[in-house]
């Protein structure tokens, strides 16, 4: 699906979508338990993949209405699925479900689309093997299809922290229902650490204890997933909020602003986007009690940013840098190359196609703002929702019309993205 966006000015109120990261974890936590109601979940292609996995393990998922799902879980004992589990394009589903599947007595096979089958899972599979489960890649390259199972009981394991924090999340969530629990030693610096903070925060809401140790984490075994009052409320998604904030900062009307609802504080590292835009000269006001962000247009100046703990913000920051004056230098971004696509290369290529001056290095992306004016053209979404949404924001400030391919991929995390842009006044034409 192509979407065409013309240079536009925006203003008005819009509600942030629920957090994808919290929704994935809440669904799986409810599956590990007896039952739970999830309030304000994100219903998207990725989170529906996690719901189907819960059902494959013997749980049930009922959509009560658009704001509630009720999950009956499998009480820490997933059954062996009767068929493969198709995780589609969701790396989070694959990794979290791989550790869950390793608790089953039999074997589970996980696969997904072409993009997912290129993503690395080797360290998690090796950890499962160390814990006396079965974890292997059918191609023996650490990539899906994956085979997991043999009911691992817990123990001690060492794992790198600089490839994906989802490995740690997967082991913590599964470890709570093992016999022995799991002690995790980090072999490297933990990148994307706020995502593990999200996990620890959510597990606490489900009455599951995690201990931070000198060299990693420990989760005692034999625990039960029991949320307070049987419910869990999903907060707004700051990864998605970043695009709405950027839209206001670069394209709000002279007498207006973009106001974003549902932006309550949480453990999300991507809430750093507020401070980043402020550092670039943006005037972002955050009413934390009301959960509202207000951002008018501003003249932005390039800054230097380390995205080691907020990889999903790289496309947004790169777009802001292309519109700002001066250089925006994005450091510590090698791990951002291992997402749905190589996001470092994709943003360098597509912003370059729009006329931006960009320098790409292995662990760094520099956007030389102010050297050229962005111009509308045909750009590729690279099958990646975050690339698509970031390019859409660039299109708001570009001369002429920009057409973005693969635009249907916003369904992964922000299904109503283009409707939200239109509601704010952007010129959006969807070609289905």
UniProtKB/Swiss-Prot annotation:
It comes from Haloquadratum walsbyi (strain DSM 16790 / HBSQ001). NCBIfam families: aroA. This is 3-phosphoshikimate 1-carboxyvinyltransferase. Signal peptide: none annotated. Monomer. Keywords: Amino-acid biosynthesis, Aromatic amino acid biosynthesis, Cytoplasm, Transferase. GO terms for cellular component: cytoplasm. The gene is aroA. It is an enzyme of class 2 (transferase). It catalyses: 3-phosphoshikimate + phosphoenolpyruvate = 5-O-(1-carboxyvinyl)-3-phosphoshikimate + phosphate. InterPro entries: Enolpyruvate_Tfrase_dom, Enolpyruvate_Tfrase_sf, EPSP_synthase, EPSP_synthase_CS, RNA3'P_cycl/enolpyr_Trfase_a/b. The active site is at 312 (proton acceptor). Belongs to the EPSP synthase family. GO terms for molecular function: 3-phosphoshikimate 1-carboxyvinyltransferase activity. Disulfide bonds: none annotated. It is found in: Cytoplasm.
């Amino acid at each position: 699906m192509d979407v065409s966006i013309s240079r536009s000015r925006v203003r008005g109120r819009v509600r942030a979508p629920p957090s994808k990261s919290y929704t994935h974890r809440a669904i799986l936590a409810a599956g590990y338990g007896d039952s739970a109601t999830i309030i304000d979940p994100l219903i998207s292609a990725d989170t529906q993949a996690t719901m189907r996995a819960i059902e494959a393990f013997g749980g049930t998922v009922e959509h009560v209405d658009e704001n509630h799902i009720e999950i009956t879980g499998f009480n820490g004992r997933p059954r062996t699925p009767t068929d493969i589990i198709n995780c589609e394009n969701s790396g989070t589903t694959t990794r979290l479900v791989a550790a869950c599947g390793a608790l089953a007595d039999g074997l589970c096979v996980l696969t997904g689309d072409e993009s997912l089958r290129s993503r690395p899972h080797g360290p998690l599979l090796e950890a499962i093997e160390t814990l006396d489960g079965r974890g292997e890649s059918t191609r023996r390259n650490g990539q899906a299809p994956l085979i997991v199972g043999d009911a691992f009981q817990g123990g001690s394991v060492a794992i790198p922290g600089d490839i994906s924090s989802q490995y740690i999340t997967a082991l913590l969530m599964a470890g709570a229902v093992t016999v022995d629990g799991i002690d995790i030693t980090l072999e490297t610096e933990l990148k994307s650490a706020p995502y593990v903070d999200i996990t620890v925060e959510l597990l606490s809401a489900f009455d599951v204890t995690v201990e931070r140790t000198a060299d990693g984490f420990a989760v005692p075994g034999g625990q039960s997933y029991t949320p307070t009052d049987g419910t869990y409320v999903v907060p707004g998604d700051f990864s998605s909020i970043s695009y709405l904030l950027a839209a206001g900062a670069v394209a709000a009307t002279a007498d207006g602003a973009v106001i974003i609802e549902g932006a309550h504080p949480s453990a999300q590292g991507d809430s750093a986007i507020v401070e980043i835009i402020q550092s670039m000269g943006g005037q972002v006001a955050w009413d934390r009690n009301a959960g509202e962000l207000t951002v008018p247009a501003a003249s932005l100046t390039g800054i230097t940013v380390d995205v080691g703990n907020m990889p999903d913000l790289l496309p947004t920051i790169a777009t802001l840098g292309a519109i700002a004056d001066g250089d925006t230098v994005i450091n510590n971004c090698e791990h951002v190359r291992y997402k749905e696509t190589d996001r470092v290369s994709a943003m360098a290529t597509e912003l370059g196609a729009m006329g931006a001056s960009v320098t790409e290095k292995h662990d760094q992306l520099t956007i030389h703002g102010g050297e050229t004016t962005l111009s509308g053209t045909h750009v590729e979404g690279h099958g990646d929702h975050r690339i698509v949404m970031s390019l859409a924001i660039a299109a708001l400030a570009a001369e002429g019309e920009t057409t973005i391919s693969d635009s249907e991929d916003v369904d992964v995390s922000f299904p109503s993205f283009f409707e939200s842009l239109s509601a704010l006044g952007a010129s959006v034409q969807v070609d289905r």
